[in-house]
Regions:
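His/Asp/Glu-enriched, well-ordered alpha-helical/loop segment
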Residues: 1-104
């Protein structure tokens, strides 16, 4: 966060505040600058820890829980892409993309 002034840091990544205000928040990445792995983004939204120091938590009041992070990266992302009527949920009329994982996602 060295590139952002202290005055502006309070507005950085306010996920919890936005969700509580009724804003549709879309999870995503800035690939190729950041990883395109949604689990990394979800992990960061949930824990908000520094990659260098796990004790350094950026604005802990803006943490989201697992369900909120999953919502951001599924339904929220589909909404942002104007595709919420056929993506983002497991529903018989929706387009499905399935991933098989070899771990418990809630532990990521």
């Amino acid at each position: 966060m060295d590139r952002v002034s202290t005055a502006h840091l309070r507005w950085a990544y306010p996920w919890k505040t936005l969700l509580q205000s009724g804003v549709v928040v879309a999870g995503g990445s800035d690939a190729p600058i950041e990883t395109c792995c949604p689990f990394t983004g979800m992990h960061d939204a949930i824990l908000r820890q520094s990659r260098d120091d796990e004790e350094d938590i950026f604005r802990p009041e803006e943490r989201v829980d697992f369900a909120e992070a999953l919502w951001m990266y599924t339904i929220g992302a589909a909404y942002a892409a104007n595709s919420e009527h056929f993506l983002g949920q497991v529903y018989h009329e929706y387009t499905h993309v399935w991933y098989v994982l070899d771990c418990v996602v809630t532990l990521l």
